[in-house]
C-alpha cells in the first residue's frame, strides 16, 4: 500500500507565529514560556511579520510611555500582518470608559489576555491557528491520560501546603503551597468536560488557600479577568460545568472565611446543581486545646455556628470530614467534646483515625501519648456516634427523588451516586432495573431516582 503523504512531495509546512516582546524581564520570561510552548507543540517562530500566520504581542502597561509603545506595536502588527493576539500587563488595563483599553483602541485584535497567561495565549493561538499534527503527541488526548472512569476526573489546582499541623509531614514532602495558573486550571477543566467527564472533583492539599501564594493574582479566561482565588475559580468552574451539564465537587476545603461565599452558589442561581452542595472539610477535632496541640485553627464554637449558617442557606448541604481520636494529651472530657460536636454539627460523612505517630512529625515530641487500646477504643466509639448521625440524616432522603450519576450497570440495574456521594469514599445508590425492558442505564448518564430505602451509608431507589 502506498503512503498517501508521498503525493505532496514534501512534508506539510508547520504554522508560523511571530513574537513581539516588550517590557520588563518578567514579561520577557512570559514570552520565553509562550515560545517554548509553541515550539513544543510544533509551531515555528517567525522573525518577520509577513512570514508569520499570526503575531503575539506581549505588552507593558506600567507607565504612559510603555502604554503608548505597546499600542503602537499592536497597530504595527495589525498593519503588517492582520492577525494579532495581545498578552501582558496592558491586557488588564481599562480605558476611561471602563472597557478594555486594547479592544477599544484596536478592536480588530483576535484575543486579549493579561500577564503570565501562557494557557490563555495558547488557547487563543489554537482557536485561530490550529496546532500541527504530531503523530506522537496526538496519541495523548487533550484531557490527558486518566486512571479514573471516563465520566469523572480529579482536577488538582495546587501543590503543597502552608500549614504546619503537628501530626502531618506533607509540607516537608510536597513543599509550600504552589497554585496553578487559573487559565491552566480552566483549560484542563474544559478539556475534561469536552472528553465526556460529568463530574469534576477539585482537589489539592488546601483548596481554600488557592491563590494565596500569588496574592490572588488576576489571570484571564475566555477574554475576561479571573482571580486566582477559590471563590472566583469555583464560580468559573460552575459556569463551565453548566455548559456541559456536569457537576463540580469540592474537596479539602479548610473553613476559611471566604468559604462562606461558596455556599450561595450551591443553593441558588444558575450554578445550583452544578457546584454541588458538598464540602469536604478536614476539621480533625473540636476541642480548642487539642486543636492547639495539633497546630490547627482552634475556634470550634465559631465553626459550629458557621456549619449551622451554611445549612440555613443551603439545606441540602452535605459535609464530609475527617478526625483524629486519641491525639497525645487528649483527655476523656476533650474526647466527649468531640462527640458532642459531631452530634450538634450533624456531619453527613465522617472518617476517623486512631492517632498514630508519623516519622518526622512534631507531634511525636508531645507529652501525654495514649496507649494503643485507648486510641482504638476512642476511634470505635467515635464511629458509633458518627454512624448514628449519618444514618439519621440519610433516612430523611427516603421518598425523595434525587439526581443520580450512574457509575456501574449490571443485571440488577445500576449503581450510582447522588450529589452527596463522592466516588470511593461515600455511599452509593442501588437503582432497580428500568421498568421498560428496552431501557438500559448507561455509565456516565444522569437519571432521576425515587429513593425507596436506606441502610447504613447507602440508598436504594427506582426510576
From Swiss-Prot:
EC class (word):
transferase
InterPro entries for this protein: Elp3/MiaA/NifB-like_rSAM, Methylthiotransferase, Methylthiotransferase_CS, Methylthiotransferase_N, Methylthiotransferase_N_sf, NA-bd_OB-fold, Ribosomal_uS12_MeSTrfase_RimO, rSAM
Superkingdom is Bacteria
Residue span(s) of domain TRAM? 395-463
What the entry lists under SMART domains is as follows: Elp3
Is RNA-binding found in the keyword set? Answer: no
- Give me the comment on cofactor binding: Binds 2 [4Fe-4S] clusters. One cluster is coordinated with 3 cysteines and an exchangeable S-adenosyl-L-methionine.
Sequence ranges assigned to domain MTTase N-terminal in this UniProt record: 15-130
- Gene3D superfamilies recorded for this chain? Methylthiotransferase, N-terminal domain, Nucleic acid-binding proteins, tm_1862 like domain
Required cofactor(s): [4Fe-4S] cluster
The residues that hold [4Fe-4S] cluster 2 are 161, 165, 168
**Which SUPFAM superfamilies does UniProt cross-reference here?**
Radical SAM enzymes
Q: GO molecular function: any one?
A: protein methylthiotransferase activity
Q: So where does [4Fe-4S] cluster 1 get bound?
A: 24, 60, 89
Q: Which NCBIfam families match?
A: 30S ribosomal protein S12 methylthiotransferase RimO, MiaB/RimO family radical SAM methylthiotransferase
Q: What protein does this entry describe?
A: Ribosomal protein uS12 methylthiotransferase RimO
